Amino acid sequence: MKKKPFYKVLYVQVIFAIIVGVILGHFYPSIATDMKPLGDGFIKLIKMVIGPIIFCTVVTGIAGMEDMKKVGRVGGKALLYFEIVSTFALLLGLAATHLLRPGVGFNIDPATLDGKAVASYAAKAHGQSTVDFLMHIIPNTMVDAFAQGEILQILLIALLFGSVLAHLGERGKVVTDFIDGLTRVLFGIVHIVTKLAPIGAFGAMAFTIGKYGVGSLVPLLKLIGTFYLTSVVFVLVVLGAIARFTGFSIIRFVSYIKEELLIVLGTSSSEAALPQLMEKLEKAGCSRSVVGLVVPTGYSFNLDGTNIYMTMAVLFIAQATNIELTWMQQLTLLAVAMLTSKGASGVTGAGFITLAATLAVVPTIPLSGMVLILGIDRFMSECRALTNIVGNGVATVVVSAWEKELDRNKLRQALKGGGEVAPTETTAGV
């Protein structure tokens, strides 16, 4: 097959668009800020199909399972993995901030901070208890879940729908076949929308640089650098070790999903690449049922980048305001962050709202301290989203391996960038 010219390759187009967006934002900020609708429009186009794709993928995956106990088993293994890896991410963020101390030297008086700028984030985060979170998973109506784009609500509906179809067997085959066909149509729509990724990335990046300016980064470069460095270490060391133990290279895996990562980089939203990621994981040998359960769940329960950010941001504010936290308070912070991070989604700004929820229950640190990082949060959200999507991709491969439903032949071919996939060779374990 003839190789595409480099300028027609999607990730090359996205890189070029991001560079042009940065240049426009720096030299013509007034024009660049008007480009925001391009980024917002692209994300809306992707979000338009996320709910239906998750529903169809999960339903067909579960309907094809002969053993319904498998649904609970896969879900249980996924949640166990999420909790273990999330704990590593929280601890790494804590350790890196203690080691590199990015907030030391600011000497900010908490009394001088104006909390009005972060009041809206605090209001959104206030009062979100565990019971509220669990009750929110149950939609008011099926239509409302899709209309609002609530991933966990759609996942609940899909689990029930798929379970009933599996129970019906041949009697439900017509419905199952219809949903399977609808899945193909939806992914076809995604392929069309993805071609617009360079335009979306250009608009989002131009707006970000145009509004905040490169100069706004300088005073807080140490925090940004610490966060990016810690996230890279997490991906290469923690996720790298998990990947190696499972039998694949984290570097090759990251290279395999580079187009999705560049879309995330341009839009700062890991949801923007969710449909493409699910399709890529299936092509890499993960079973549809595992992909359908693990990826959507991971977008609420496996946000590694957000976890690193949470502990790092809280400790940074404490260091900047010269507030000493005891080890008991830091352990409390870990426990609280473990819960509040589960309410975050893959949308820009969700990490900042989650931070407000964490600070609200750690009264030692003033909530108004969030203004210190409000201006740079947009620049950190890219790294959060990138780490989140890599973490969810690795989690899906690992759970597929645990379930003995990972086609290692397909995985090897995909990560090598090979063409034809050899006959199925299902894994015999991790």
UniProtKB/Swiss-Prot annotation:
Listed A to Z, the keywords are: Cell inner membrane, Cell membrane, Membrane, Symport, Transmembrane, Transmembrane helix, Transport
Please tell me where this protein is predominantly located.
Answer: membrane
Please provide the Gene Ontology terms (biological process) for this protein: L-aspartate transmembrane transport
The regions listed as transmembrane in this protein's record are 9-29, 45-65, 79-99, 149-169, 185-205, 223-243, 308-328, 356-376
Disulfide pairings:
none
Where is this protein found?
Answer: Cell inner membrane
Q: What does this protein do?
A: Responsible for the transport of dicarboxylates such as succinate, fumarate, and malate from the periplasm across the membrane.
This chain belongs to which protein, by name?
Answer: C4-dicarboxylate transport protein
| Biological source species | Burkholderia cenocepacia (strain HI2424)
- In the UniProt record, the gene name given for this protein reads dctA
